[in-house]
Structures are given as structure tokens and as C-alpha cells.
Regions:
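Membrane-interface loops
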Residues: 36-52, 80-150
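Hydrophobic alpha-helical transmembrane segments
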Residues: 63-76, 91, 146-149
Length: 150
């Protein structure tokens, strides 16, 4: 018996995978945006951090792996070659999203550190992120949860 779960065999289920992405993509942006706007409307939102975290350096290039999860999210469906596997994968992603958004709504936490100014390609990526993201999703880390599933 293999320790790795079977992804199924055969062809990529394009229709089913794209259908799930057509549901999960908009759901992500709508629910995530809703949670952020609700937290912003609260006014004062707490932060949770340790003093030693101020010593962690800011590396602008880390925006690239951060953004890469969006690509990996979509590509992850190409590894699912059975209907049951596609559905299970999509439901795991949906569950992580629901849990994170519920936490963001119930216990919003604001990022306490201001990002330094960044220019060039990395600056453009940070600007694109800032166009739809607000600092009210400190915990749980939805990116890490999705990355573990992917």
C-alpha cells in the first residue's frame, strides 16, 4: 500500500476542474473581501505579535512565492484524474476558505507592521495585492492552509 494517496489515473477532468474553479475563484474574492470590509467597519482591530518579530527582515522578493500560490491553486486541479479526487480536493480548499473567513469575521486581527516602500517589479506585485487586500487577515493564515492542501 502506498503512503501517498492516489490522485486517480487517466485524463485530466477539464470540465469538472474548471467548473470547481469557476465556483471557488469568485467565492474566494467575495468571501475574503466581505470579511475584510466587515473588519474594517469595526474600527479598532487588535494585533497579535511578539516583539522579536520586529527583527525579522523584510525581503521584497518574497512576494513572488506569495503570489505563486494563485497559480498553484489552479494548476493543482490538473493532478486530480478522478471525479472523486477532484471533488475532494475542491471541498478541502472550500473548507479551508470557510474556516479562515469565519475566523476573520469572528476574530479579526490586523497586521501591525507597515510594509516599507518597494519599487520595480516587486513593488508592482505589492501594489496589485494592496488593490484588493486589507490588513485584517492576520490569522489564521489562509495562504498556508491552502498551500498545505495543494
Amino acid at each position: 500500500m502506498s503512503a501517498r494517496p492516489s490522485l486517480g489515473s487517466g485524463r485530466i477532468l477539464w470540465g469538472r476542474s474548471l467548473a470547481w474553479l469557476a465556483v471557488l475563484g469568485p467565492f474566494f474574492f467575495l468571501s475574503y473581501g466581505f470579511a475584510n470590509s466587515q473588519a474594517a467597519a469595526r474600527g479598532e482591530v487588535a494585533s497579535l505579535y511578539f516583539e522579536w518579530e520586529h527583527a525579522i527582515p523584510f525581503w521584497p522578493w518574497t512576494i513572488v512565492p506569495y503570489w505563486s500560490i494563485d497559480l498553484l491553486y489552479g494548476l493543482s486541479f490538473l493532478f486530480c484524474r478522478a471525479r472523486r479526487v477532484v471533488d475532494r480536493h475542491a471541498l478541502r480548499l472550500l473548507t479551508a476558505q470557510l474556516i479562515a473567513v469565519l475566523c476573520f469575521l469572528q476574530f479579526p486581527l490586523r497586521f501591525a507592521f507597515e510594509r516599507p516602500a518597494v519599487e520595480g517589479v516587486f513593488g508592482a506585485l505589492f501594489d496589485a495585492l494592496a488593490a484588493f487586500d486589507q490588513p485584517f487577515n492576520q490569522a489564521p493564515s489562509l495562504h498556508i492552509a491552502l498551500l498545505v492542501i495543494i
